[in-house]
């Protein structure tokens, strides 16, 4: 999303308050060894080679998505322009027969249903999408609903009944909808979206792999492991969405840097979720904070389960928050590279999520018994600010 955003980031031994951080120097070799992660499927492109760092493996997915977009540009579909779309491969509005019109009406209803879900569960983001072109906002709604349904499998009311086989069936549905064979209306909306925009299936599969990790893994030894998990459950969303949101025609950024910045925003959001929900996760027996870093700080699992805020905990949290902000900073450099009609919802999401970190600090780092949130007044202030930032073209944001 920004020309000066490093195309990828490499781990190296540097500490901030006892926390491993990332370096944007691409020429430096990685000195961290990545622990082998044996996911249940064993087929994820991201986890295929355990020798490299998680970041390096995730970058392969970034390259693949960027290549798809470049290929689409060469085929003159013009995804970076806000050209009006009147149909898709799945359903053609121009068909004159009754069956064609019925299909078109059903598709419109499917997208409307997705919009209703987005409006109910992501109100601020939904308002931002209303500034997009009708075609783009409907596609973003469809992606949002699929991601929400996927997350609900392991984090919803029926999560205790979900098995690995259920996730396998969900992945089968994903494959089918990418082949133009949706199971229900929500799937139909996404099937139309992925047939219209150059969206790769891999980030969707990787998100399902993230749900598999949640079923069998509740602790992460290193930040490298946690980074991979954050990519699976949140970074993937950025890779799904950018092909729909589009890149500004005047942008001088490389396609890879646009997707890398989108990935950074997803990682930042998930790290923020983890820091906000420490107490809630602990009550479920889960600790997402890197075990190695906790050990270096002298913090045991029992300490977290007791939930007592001490100077030791405050110092540890300062480092964790600083790292999350680093990811937000990298993402922020690139939002202006998006299509002008797509910037506001992204800016709104970024600014609001950053304020959750501020709220943790305002709570004196008590994320055991207090849930950090952004109040309505601050949200109302953030929305105009997000809108004003969305007006700036790429060349003016450096």
From Swiss-Prot:
PROSITE patterns documented for this protein: SQUALEN_PHYTOEN_SYN_1, SQUALEN_PHYTOEN_SYN_2
Q: Where in the cell is it found?
A: Plastid, Chloroplast
InterPro entries attached to this UniProt entry: Isoprenoid_synthase_dom_sf (IPR008949), Squ/phyt_synthse (IPR002060), Squalene/phytoene_synthase_CS (IPR019845), Trans_IPPS_bact-type (IPR044843), Trans_IPPS_HH (IPR033904)
Per the record, the GO terms for biological process are: carotenoid biosynthetic process
Alphabetized CDD domains for the sequence:
Trans_IPPS_HH
- Classify the main location: plastid
Q: Which family does it belong to?
A: Belongs to the phytoene/squalene synthase family.
The protein's matches in PANTHER family, at most eight in alphabetical order, are given as: BIFUNCTIONAL LYCOPENE CYCLASE/PHYTOENE SYNTHASE
Assembly description: Monomer.
Question: What's the protein name?
Answer: Phytoene synthase, chloroplastic
Record organism: Daucus carota
| Gene name of the encoded protein | PSY
């Amino acid at each position: 999303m920004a020309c000066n955003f490093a195309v990828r980031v490499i781990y190296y031994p540097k500490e901030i308050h006892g926390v491993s951080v990332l370096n944007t120097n691409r020429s430096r070799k990685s000195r961290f060894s990545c622990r082998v992660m044996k996911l249940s499927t064993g087929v994820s492109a991201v986890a295929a080679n355990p020798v490299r760092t998680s970041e390096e493996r995730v970058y392969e997915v970034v390259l693949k998505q960027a290549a798809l977009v470049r290929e689409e540009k060469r085929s003159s579909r013009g995804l970076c322009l806000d050209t009006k779309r009147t149909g898709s491969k799945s359903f053609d509005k121009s068909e004159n027969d009754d069956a064609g019109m019925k299909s078109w009406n059903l598709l419109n209803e499917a997208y409307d249903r997705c919009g209703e879900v987005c409006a109910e569960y992501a109100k601020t983001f939904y308002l931002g999408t209303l500034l997009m072109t009708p075609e783009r906002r409907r596609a973003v709604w469809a992606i949002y609903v699929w991601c929400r349904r996927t997350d609900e499998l392991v984090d919803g009311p029926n999560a205790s009944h979900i098995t690995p086989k259920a996730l396998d069936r969900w992945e089968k549905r994903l494959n089918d909808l990418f082949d133009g064979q949706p199971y229900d209306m929500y799937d139909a909306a996404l099937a139309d979206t992925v047939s219209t925009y150059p969206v790769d299936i891999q980030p969707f599969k990787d998100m399902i792999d993230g749900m598999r990790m949640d079923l069998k893994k509740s602790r992460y030894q290193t930040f490298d492991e946690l980074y991979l998990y954050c990519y699976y459950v949140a970074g993937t969303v950025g890779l799904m969405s950018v092909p729909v949101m589009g890149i500004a025609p005047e942008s001088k950024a490389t396609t890879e840097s646009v997707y890398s910045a989108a990935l950074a925003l997803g990682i930042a959001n998930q790290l923020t979720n983890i820091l906000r929900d420490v107490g809630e996760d602990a009550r479920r027996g889960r600790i997402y904070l890197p075990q190695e870093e906790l050990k270096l700080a002298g913090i045991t699992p029992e300490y977290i389960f007791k939930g007592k805020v001490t100077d030791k905990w405050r110092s540890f949290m300062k480092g964790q928050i600083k790292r999350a902000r680093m990811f937000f900073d990298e993402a922020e450099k690139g939002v202006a590279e998006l299509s002008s009609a797509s910037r506001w919802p992204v800016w709104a999401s970024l600014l609001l999520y950053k304020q959750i970190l501020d709220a943790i600090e305002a709570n004196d780092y008590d994320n055991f018994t207090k849930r950090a949130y952004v109040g309505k007044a601050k949200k109302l202030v953030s929305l105009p600010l997000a809108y004003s930032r969305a007006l700036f073209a790429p060349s003016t944001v450096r």
